[in-house]
Amino acid sequence: MSKSENLYSAARELIPGGVNSPVRAFTGVGGTPLFIEKADGAYLYDVDGKAYIDYVGSWGPMVLGHNHPAIRNAVIEAAERGLSFGAPTEMEVKMAQLVTELVPTMDMVRMVNSGTEATMSAIRLARGFTGRDKIIKFEGCYHGHADCLLVKAGSGALTLGQPNSPGVPADFAKHTLTCTYNDLASVRAAFEQYPQEIACIIVEPVAGNMNCVPPLPEFLPGLRALCDEFGALLIIDEVMTGFRVALAGAQDYYGVEPDLTCLGKIIGGGMPVGAFGGRRDVMDALAPTGPVYQAGTLSGNPIAMAAGFACLNEVAQPGVHETLDELTTRLAEGLREAAEEAGIPLVVNHVGGMFGIFFTDAESVTCYQDVMACDVERFKRFFHMMLDEGVYLAPSAFEAGFMSVAHSMEDINNTIDAARRVFAKL
């Protein structure tokens, strides 16, 4: 047995499923998950000594690549002053100043410890600010594991949500309306059925949890207009897209102003950080200045703030996003060409430093139904064959891939060459 297999066997006796987040178990592709010993730049190194070109990037945070010296040094320096104080620090102020400068729609920001905390807190704030209970989310969009968000669509866009995880009371789920991503008609229908009851829409501006599905041109502006028409708040969940699709996020890339924004992943530089913020009048409703309660023992942790501050300063440097886009575009084009040469039907979506691979005969993939029609079994084979070639993709047909500026054009070309060999055998 390999070291990964031995560790996985031991882990399953001690940790549910052997992992601390389900997708890591390779449930979506089968086989034994890799146990990682170290990472540097664009590469992961497993406990058995094999190196992989990494397109998971810790599920998004590693936009600069692994073990970036500026972040590593910031963490070491901060740790020498203490690990946690439970009191305000100067770095929290500097971090808030930087975030609000980089994302102009955020007048104020509250730091938390994860993307889930950010989205659940933003929704609570929207409900408290509007005095309404219902929310709209989209089928196939994931916003963390808060109870009100673990809801799938029923039969039709207006069906009251049913929980898709045991442990979520139906009384919670009934306030979550699930609409179809990229379908404004379904959203208008929900508002017309509940015109005075919907507090907010929460949306991934690029749906990254049904792989990578960009918005149609009219979709995000249409959501903004519907929120304005019916008095609801628009929450853009930029946990995945923030500082990756563009410096000011997908909201800047697509030209849409939300009322609230949720951030995570890149904002922590690899440390556990989330944030939410937006309009000053809305944020003023948050405790201690307002009645909507939110708190956290480790929120604004000095080590995490130092890592995030260092990361964002690097991400804000000229040329970073141009490089991400160039590398991702080359990868997407190369994969399409290699698949076409082999007669493999393939769609590759990409925006900024995100991409998605879909085995499908369709010309495009724009919604959850399109994603579910893709050939998942072929993706599983593709994943394992690419892994054997030394390329680490997300171990699920429903997760986006992530580029970093640490990837070289040689890495991209080697990945395309590996895919060409795999497609020939697929």
UniProtKB/Swiss-Prot annotation:
Cellular location(s): Cytoplasm
Record flagged with keyword Iron: no
One BP term from GO: protoporphyrinogen IX biosynthetic process
EC number: 5.4.3.8
Modified residues (N6-(pyridoxal phosphate)lysine): K265
Gene3D superfamilies in UniProt: Aspartate Aminotransferase, domain 1, Type I PLP-dependent aspartate aminotransferase-like (Major domain)
InterPro entries given in the database record: 4pyrrol_synth_GluAld_NH2Trfase (IPR004639), Aminotrans_3 (IPR005814), Aminotrans_3_PPA_site (IPR049704), PyrdxlP-dep_Trfase (IPR015424), PyrdxlP-dep_Trfase_major (IPR015421), PyrdxlP-dep_Trfase_small (IPR015422)
Pathway assignment: Porphyrin-containing compound metabolism; protoporphyrin-IX biosynthesis; 5-aminolevulinate from L-glutamyl-tRNA(Glu): step 2/2
Reactions listed under catalytic activity: (S)-4-amino-5-oxopentanoate = 5-aminolevulinate
Annotated SUPFAM superfamilies: PLP-dependent transferases
One GO cellular component, as annotated: cytoplasm
UniProt GO MF annotations: glutamate-1-semialdehyde 2,1-aminomutase activity; pyridoxal phosphate binding; transaminase activity
Enzyme class: isomerase
Keyword annotations: Cytoplasm, Isomerase, Porphyrin biosynthesis, Pyridoxal phosphate
Recorded family membership: Belongs to the class-III pyridoxal-phosphate-dependent aminotransferase family. HemL subfamily.
Assembly behavior: Homodimer.
PANTHER family reported for this sequence: GLUTAMATE-1-SEMIALDEHYDE 2,1-AMINOMUTASE, GLUTAMATE-1-SEMIALDEHYDE 2,1-AMINOMUTASE 1, CHLOROPLASTIC-RELATED
Protein name: Glutamate-1-semialdehyde 2,1-aminomutase
Lineage: Bacteria, Pseudomonadati, Pseudomonadota, Gammaproteobacteria, Enterobacterales
